[in-house]
Regions:
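Acidic, Gly/Ser/Thr-rich repeat motifs that build Ca2+-stabilized beta-propeller blades
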Residues: 48-226, 284-287, 292-300, 349-387, ...
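Beta-propeller blade signature
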Residues: 172-180, 231-247, 310-311
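Conserved blade-ending motifs and adjacent loop-strand segments that build the rim/top face
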Residues: 279, 390-411
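Short, conserved, GDST-rich strand-edge loop motifs in beta-rich repeat architectures
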Residues: 218-238, 305-306
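Surface-exposed loop and turn segments in beta-propeller and other repeat-based domains
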Residues: 82, 125-139, 187-204, 238, ...
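C-terminal motif of bacterial Sec signal peptides marking the signal peptidase cleavage site
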Residues: 12-14
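Extracellular mucin-like PTS domains
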Residues: 23-54
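Bacterial signal peptide processing site
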Residues: 16-18
Length: 432
């Protein structure tokens, strides 16, 4: 994401070339928060009035998922999902596959809070507090990504991506919860990867395990205007790329391994971790839990916000292209070998795309199989269906006043909308 006015925006087989480091600081977990509202100090965003907390679920008559396209996309609105909870500077949501039905929310200054996925929940607890290690001095820096190990129930591992200072770095680390159902041990950090950042913006930050069990990491181009260092088209740097690494067998130093089928393994001068490249700032990618497809938005420079389906080894064009048009120069660029977005929009739709999920829940049959995404600046939310070749349906489903910093998903595939100002919302059809 990007700074907009004064608001924080977000937005191998063989030798392994990875960076490791010791834990920089130690910190203790504060007391569990018992008040209905969890507020982290030094908040810069002001809360906005929230609509009445009314939510009702639309359910199916049986346990079978809806059929894709059985109902056309339709207009919706948003309502508070957890009216007793409010958080400042929310940037992501995740859940562990441990049967606990808990949700975990990332707060940009460096805190993760956890709570029951229950509309009537009254309190959240602090799961991890690493504010002493996290730098959020740059408007797009901070604690930006969380992924639970696929075997979290057994090993209690989870992974975070955050910004550090002096020097300016993006850090990927593994932590351990005391037990899978408890708070995290802040002293358990094992740094996996540190990436030097030339500027304070375009940090990416999304991390997620794919259906193949590997960890995918989203990195922006390193920042500033127009990718001045050319990182997007440079395979010798990890910046401007989606990485794919194996973290299941970390050695004592924290070193990961690179899957042998990564596209640039063995290519001279290329980093083997790279899965796809030519990316400006991928703010919130996700895997379709049914098809396994990787959906990724890319925040644009001045003209276009775009959505892509990421595939092995492809070049998504930045900084030759912005969206489907030449960047600088604005015409005559060589587009050979570049992958075009499946959709894009200009400034009439907003200014900073936020990626969501392919909906696989049961509450909203008309949305089943559609990719849901939004815009931080305009508060608009769209849904689209894609048949593997082309878009078959595309609709603006919500026009809100929210600052959409992220989307979330629970264990049942239901989608939440996170507004940076403090509210968590769900999508609702009509008055239901």
């Amino acid at each position: 994401m990007r700074l907009w006015i004064a608001l924080v925006a977000l937005l191998v087989v063989g030798c392994v070339d990875s960076s490791t480091a010791a834990v920089r600081h130690e910190t203790t977990i504060p007391s569990i928060v018992t008040s209905p509202t969890v507020t982290i100090p030094a908040t810069t965003a002001a809360a906005m009035p929230m609509p009445p907390p009314t939510v009702a679920a639309q359910t199916l008559q049986d346990d079978q998922p809806p059929s894709i396209g059985a109902e056309p996309l339709q207009k919706m609105h948003v309502q508070r999902a957890f009216p007793n909870l409010s958080f400042k500077r929310m940037v992501d949501m995740a859940y562990p596959d441990d049967g606990s039905n808990r949700l975990f929310v990332l707060l940009q200054p460096g805190v993760i809070v956890a709570f029951a996925n229950d509309r009537n929940v009254e309190a959240a607890e602090v799961f991890l507090d690493i504010r002493e290690r996290v730098s959020d001095r740059g408007n797009e820096e901070g604690l930006l990504g969380l992924a639970f190990d696929p075997d979290f129930r057994a090993n209690s591992y989870f992974y975070v991506y955050y910004s550090a200072a002096n020097p300016r770095l993006s850090v990927l680390s593994r932590f351990t919860a005391h037990t899978a159902g408890s708070v995290a041990n802040a002293d358990s950090e094992r740094v996996i990867l540190e990436i030097e950042q030339p500027y304070s913006n375009h940090n990416g930050g999304q991390i997620a395990f794919g259906p193949d069990g590997y960890l995918y990491v989203g990195l922006g181009d390193g920042g500033s205007r127009g990718d001045p260092k050319g990182n997007g088209q440079n395979l010798s740097t990890l910046l401007g790329s989606i990485l794919r690494i194996a973290v299941g067998t970390l050695d004592e130093s924290g070193s990961y391994s690179i899957p042998a089928d990564n596209p640039f393994v063995g290519s001279e001068g290329a980093r083997g971790e790279i899965w796809a490249y030519g990316i400006r700032n991928p703010w919130r990618f996700s895997f379709d839990r049914e098809s396994g497809e990787l959906w990724m938005p890319d925040v644009g420079q001045n003209r276009f916000e775009e959505v892509n389906i990421v595939r092995r080894g492809l070049n998504y064009g930045w900084n030759v292209m912005e969206g489907s048009e030449c960047f600088e120069p604005s015409r005559g660029c060589d587009t050979q070998g570049l992958e075009m977005p499946i959709t894009e929009y200009g400034r009439e739709g907003g200014c900073s795309v936020t990626g969501g999920y392919v909906y696989r829940g049961k509450r909203l049959p008309s949305l089943y199989g559609a990719y849901v995404y939004g815009d931080f600046c305009s508060g608009k939310i769209w849904a689209l269906r894609h048949d593997g070749t082309k878009i078959t349906e595309h609709l603006e489903i919500v026009d809100s006043k929210l600052e959409i910093s992220s989307f979330g998903e629970d264990q049942n595939g239901e989608i939440f909308v996170l507004s940076f100002d403090g509210g968590i919302y769900r999508l609702v059809v009509g008055g239901r």
